[in-house]
A protein has these predicted regions:
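Transmembrane alpha-helices and adjacent helix-loop boundaries
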Residues: 1-218
Length: 218
């Protein structure tokens, strides 16, 4: 089998542009997911029963359904409710953020519960409220412990973001599909796409490892 290196060279800039969009989607989704996950994770541990109940429903629903279905719900079902078309970028970020938020909520919950209960009791004995103790004592310690699973979530979303290609959003996978539709060189293009994903995952894993070692020394 002869590889078309000229085609690979000419297609590579387009694929790299798609990879940049993939990184953008992942960063935004995990960023918003952090905000959602932090609030939901704390809500699952608070003393307000209604908040705990709603947080549990959200986490169970998102973790119990596929990201692809969630993308379809936002892109195809939501317009029927709001009466207007949903932009693919908005649909991609919304679905991925909501999905990531549920998994990050579990990461935060596990991280908080890994801190000794005596820390909360010590904070309360000093006159701090539950929220103040959580903010100033529990969360700083928990955050150091959740860096590795947060890195794993970023890597998972980096790969899972390829699912937004089904709504026509031109990230890395969709760019590969469009090039193949024009050139019929499926092997060369998919190998390039796979290698780009591999490099991105490797770089993220290395970065997370550096962060983890940095926090361990503090």
């Amino acid at each position: 089998m002869n590889l078309n290196f000229d085609l690979i060279a000419s297609s590579f800039p387009l694929l790299l542009a798609g990879a940049a969009i993939t990184v953008e989607i992942t960063a935004l989704s995990v960023g918003f997911g952090l905000l959602i996950g932090c609030m939901v994770g704390i809500a699952r541990l608070c003393n307000v029963k209604a908040l705990r109940y709603l947080a549990n429903i959200y986490v169970d629903f998102i973790r119990g359904t596929s990201l692809l279905v969630q993308i379809f719900l936002v892109y195809f079902a939501l317009p029927g409710i709001i009466g207007s078309r949903v932009d693919p970028f908005f649909a991609a970020i919304s679905a991925c953020s909501i999905n990531s938020g549920a998994y990050i909520a579990e990461i935060f919950r596990a991280g908080i519960q890994s801190i000794d209960q005596g820390q909360m009791e010590a904070g309360r004995s000093l006159g701090m409220t539950w929220a103040q103790t959580m903010r100033y004592i529990i969360m700083p310690q928990a955050f150091k412990r959740i860096i590795p699973p947060l890195g794993n979530e970023f890597i998972a979303m980096l790969k899972d973001s390829s699912l937004v290609s089904v709504i026509g959003f031109e990230e890395l996978t969709r760019r590969g599909q469009l090039i193949i539709a024009r050139t019929y060189a499926s092997f060369e293009i998919w190998m390039c796409v796979a290698l780009i994903y591999l490099v991105m995952v490797f770089l993220v894993a290395r970065f997370v490892g550096v962060l983890e070692r940095k926090f361990e020394t503090k």
